[in-house]
Amino acid sequence: MQNEHSEFAKMSQTLTNVQELRLRASTTRHALSDIVREKDWSDFQFAPIREATVSRAMTTRYFEDLYRYAVSDVVIVGAGSSGLSAAYVLAKNRPDLRIAIIEANVAPGGGAWLGGQLFSAMIMRKPTHLFLDELEIPYEDEGDYVVVKHAALFTSTVLSKVLQFPNVKLFNATAVEDLVTKPSANGGVTIAGVVTNWTLVTMAHDVQSCMDPNVIELEGYKDDGTRDPKKKHGVVLSTTGHDGPFGAFCAKRLAALDAQHAIKGMQSLDMNTAEAGVVKESGATAGVEYMYFAGMETATKKGVSRMGPTFGAMAVSGIKAAEEILRHFAE
């Protein structure tokens, strides 16, 4: 009998809640409530505009960005979870740095829009939850790990925060085709920038000839192209992942330039060794000045195991690489 009363009470409360929601719906308020007649949108109009105005508004701003970021302090190649995490830490701590993010896809975020096997939830092992706390992303605490209800919640949140920084520009649908290099005084390679093109052009080089690229130069050079010792040299952080047409691109390009930077290849799945390994191996590259790696590109380059559908190392490796880059600019 007691259980029946309990169930009846729950049903009554549910019905009451539904009635309240219906009552609220009858007087719904939204952003346009003051300019739209209730239940009648027949007189709704947008402000007038000329087609050329739209074109000029887009064009001028994009080319202003191209001009401003033609010389950048930090170029991040790949806007996946590690690249975006690094961008957040860098932009937050150094608002004076010009940070260009180059993403080959139209949609940034890499593989972090879904969890494993196209499922929704994102699993992150502790202590990555501290980064989620900073970003104010809710999660379920399961002891040693946390669960974000949908991977897209993490990606959209960090992406939104990164894009709001005034010193960050995302160039999506843009591919890095090559690296700009110069001889190093110590006999290695100095990274001086990246070579860019529209992604669709890059992928069409086999069907059309003579489609030359553009460049983004790293800060640190005079107008004649020689090194300016008065300026802090910029850096490239490559976070291009391991899959797709541009996976591990910068690691592969370095290997092609110099055999000592040969790719070891990503090893089979082992979550416990993989995540710690990716974080430990992320950061600066020996023998290559001003070049940093993070995320799954690190696993491919250094021969670390893959971790599969657990994302803590993606964020943390980006944070670690960002910390090293911040030290570089602080020296």
UniProtKB/Swiss-Prot annotation:
The keyword Transferase applies. It is an enzyme of class 2 (transferase). The modification 2,3-didehydroalanine (Cys) is found at residue 210. Substrate binds at residues 82, 103-104, 111, 176, 212, 242, 296, 306-308. GO terms for biological process: mitochondrial genome maintenance; thiamine biosynthetic process; thiazole biosynthetic process. Its main location: cytoplasm. Transmembrane segments: none annotated. One of its GO terms (cellular component) is nucleus. Its EC number is 2.4.2.60. It holds the Pfam family Thi4. It catalyses: [ADP-thiazole synthase]-L-cysteine + glycine + NAD(+) = [ADP-thiazole synthase]-dehydroalanine + ADP-5-ethyl-4-methylthiazole-2-carboxylate + nicotinamide + 3 H2O + 2 H(+). During the catalytic reaction, a sulfide is transferred from Cys-210 to a reaction intermediate, generating a dehydroalanine residue. Belongs to the THI4 family. Homooctamer. This is Thiamine thiazole synthase. It comes from Eremothecium gossypii (strain ATCC 10895 / CBS 109.51 / FGSC 9923 / NRRL Y-1056).
